[in-house]
A protein has these predicted regions:
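A short SAM/SAH-binding and catalytic strip from SAM-dependent methyltransferases
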Residues: 106-120, 135-137
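Conserved Class I S-adenosyl-L-methionine
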Residues: 145-167, 173-225
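Short helix-loop-beta connector
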Residues: 33-47
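A short acidic, Gly/Pro-enriched loop at the edge of an enzyme's catalytic core
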Residues: 97-109
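Class I SAM-dependent methyltransferase SAM/SAH-binding core
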Residues: 47-98
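Conserved beta-strand signature within the Rossmann-like core of class I S-adenosyl-L-methionine
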Residues: 128-139
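Class I SAM-dependent methyltransferase Rossmann-like catalytic core
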Residues: 2-26, 30
Length: 225
């Protein structure tokens, strides 16, 4: 499985280089729109919870939006420790199966690439709130798979199925990026499920690369009560 501290730092360094900035910026814009569209008569900041926040790359960016009080949690202690250094949000260690928050506590809930716990997500979301979930698009990291596999395949674009929340909107965020170092290639590989199910002989194909061009492709879905 590797060293959790090393993997957390590797993930942080990769994201800090801006490869996934298009997704970060799209999430920030959604938060800005929520704040600007809030009724003028409503007092106080909007509350946001980022589920499985990792090392806080997206959380801190969303939390920096004026008028937002952001919180993020992760099961990994090292992830939370790194996230706390970013600021612009309050971070804590928790399990998504039992989120330590009151019913309806958050105006916005965000969940990027994490398992979908319908019951808990719906519970902590305010009655008029929005839940944003992010899943990989069909061509996400296709360039990586072209190197790893003789017959690369497109991702199934599977949105979470839920009976407690209603899908009200979707948007795609896509770009083409060039990973500039072997460390970046290895870091993004470790962030994918392919890392754990790819044969060692196929992994060696990546080890010989110094740069890699690939699509990134995300789907952001909005759910409400």
């Amino acid at each position: 499985m590797g060293d959790p501290k090393s993997q957390a730092r590797s993930r942080r360094d990769f994201l800090n280089r801006g490869y996934y900035a298009p997704l970060r910026d799209a999430m920030v814009e959604l938060v800005r729109k929520q704040v600007s569209g809030r009724a003028a008569s409503t007092n106080g900041p909007m509350t946001l919870l980022d589920i499985c926040c990792g090392e806080g790359y997206y959380t801190s960016a969303m939390g920096a939006v004026p008028g937002v009080d952001a919180y993020g949690f992760d099961l990994g202690k090292e992830m939370v420790r790194l996230a706390a250094k970013r600021g612009d949000a309050a971070y804590f260690v928790a399990n998504m199966k039992d989120i330590p928050a009151a019913d309806g506590a958050f105006d916005m809930v965000t969940e990027l690439f994490a398992p979908f716990n319908e019951r808990e997500f719906a519970r902590v979301l305010a009655p008029e709130g929005s839940l944003y979930t992010v899943v990989p698009g069909a061509r996400h990291l296709f360039g990586l798979k072209e190197v790893l596999y003789d017959t690369p395949y497109l991702n199934d674009e599977k949105l979470p199925k839920t009976t407690e929340l209603e899908l009200v909107g979707m948007q795609r965020v896509s770009a083409n990026i060039t990973l500039q170092t072997q460390a970046d290639i290895e870091a993004v590989f470790q962030m994918t499920p392919y890392y754990y199910r790819t044969r060692p002989s196929d992994k060696e194909r990546l080890a010989n690369l110094d740069t890699l061009q690939t699509d990134i492709d995300f789907i952001i879905a909005e759910y409400r009560h």
